[in-house]
């Protein structure tokens, strides 16, 4: 068994629509073609062992099935003018509820920073960060994600 303590982290996700490098924040909206939700699954027990040894966390964050992306919605630049609300229910209980206005870096700043180090390519996804409420999952749990009140996904952990 790879991990006995996997946690969910709901995040806003933006899909890149054209190739870009060294993108200024003021132009970032021109590189986004859609947005939606994603779940970043983390093996906390694996992460703790790696942290103790001062090692990188990629084994805890980048394993098979460690990311899920919802249906994506068309993006318009005006969406960045106001906070984007998103939430996650686990087994019908609200566990995460947040909005883009609570993020330390907004999506334009994220794109500017990431594009300094990596060429962004058409189809790349940028996960933005997670609101409070991260927690463990178990086989059979049902996760439902909503964006601006619209349900974008429902998945059962297997």
Regions found by a protein language model. Give the residues of each.
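Catalytic-core "active-site belt" of small-molecule-metabolizing enzymes
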Residues: 1-121, 125, 133-158
């Amino acid at each position: 068994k790879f991990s006995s303590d996997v946690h969910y982290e709901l995040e806003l996700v933006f899909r890149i629509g054209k190739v870009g490098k060294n993108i200024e924040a003021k132009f970032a909206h021109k590189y986004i073609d859609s947005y939606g939700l994603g779940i970043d699954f983390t093996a906390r027990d694996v992460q703790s062992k790696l942290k103790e040894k001062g090692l990188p966390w990629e084994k805890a964050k980048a394993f098979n099935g460690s990311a899920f992306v919802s249906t994506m919605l068309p993006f318009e630049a005006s969406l960045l003018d106001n906070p984007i609300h998103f939430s996650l229910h686990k087994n019908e209980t609200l566990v995460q509820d947040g909005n883009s206005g609570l993020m330390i870096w907004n999506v334009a700043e994220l794109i500017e920073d990431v594009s300094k180090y990596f060429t962004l390519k058409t189809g790349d996804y940028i996960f933005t960060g997670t609101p409070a409420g991260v927690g463990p999952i178990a086989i059979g749990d049902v996760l439902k994600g909503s964006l601006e009140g619209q349900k974008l996904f429902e998945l059962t952990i297997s």
